[in-house]
Amino acid sequence: MLKELPNEQLNLISLCFVQDFKYKKLEIDEKLDEIVNKQITNIEKDCKKFKDAIIYFGNGYMGEKNKHGMPDGMGNLLFHASEDFYVGQFNNGLKHGLGKYTYMSGGGSAHHPFSIPYYAGEWFADSYHGLGKHLITEYESLMIYEGTHTHDKKTGFGTYKRFNNDDVDKFCNTELIGYFLDGQGFKLMIEINRDDNGSLTKNTPSGFFEYDLEKGEKTPLLLFNEIDEWEKKIEPKKMDKELLDIFNDSYKEFFNLDPFTKEFSDLTIKVKKNVMQLMFDTNKYFEKNSEDENYLKFLQKINSLNKVVTQIDEKQKLIELNEMIEKEKKEFVSIEKKLNS
């Protein structure tokens, strides 16, 4: 642990980490600006040309489709029950690529009646995955997360921002910058706490901290006395090799998690496409078989399997789930013969 190092060495290493984290933050900010304010904005403009709507799982869809009639390419999806909507790219019925999901069902919350939550960024197999920006309205303070998402979780490098009011164009009052594991600060974090004038607060320290999630504790490694120390005096800089070795050792367990592997991602989209195709094939019989109890039970079972996919974070469990889906596909072959078409 860094806090066990001699003070002189600790200060030097902490400053190097802060420089690197600032470099990563600026790099992500630049990429996110390109994704959210340029690429997705262009997709939203292009999607306005679509006029003909179809019903897709009880929701309204306007856009490009594949040969099976599933969303594929660019399009707009309006969810009937919640009035949420997604504008962006699809692959075989899945939100996949770039897009923006607006949570109309979460708008007008008691805390923030005029703020509508959304996620804009990269998607993979119906999940937030890659770089994205997430406006969060469910807490007393308005919050924004900007950074890496991994299979629907705020896992990876990013920045959490907290605002004392609903003006997100103004500076935020709290920033947490570093690596997150399912939304929780992991090990080393930069924490900036500002008052409503933009200066550092006197009661809550700002600086570079070592977090201990199990104990719920944080240890200051390098403190800032003035906001300029962070905003102007600290120059962003990539890590050198010696520091990179310390970093890799500290975060070894983090990057060895299954969701970071290509194998896990490949398996996830395979399972998602598999269950989505099965849902699509089974739901087209609904209109003429809505009173068939066996058919309805089968639909519920498939819908449950679909919800489970994004909750799994271990490769072996994904493999087991895919085996279950393959088994259900075989069962549907016999069920299909008894359905009215």
Describe the predicted segments one by one:
Residues I227, I234-S341:
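PAZ/PAZ-like end-binding module
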Residues M1-M239, I302, L321, I325, ...:
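Intrinsically disordered, low-complexity repeat tracts enriched in Gly/Pro/Ser/Thr and acidic residues
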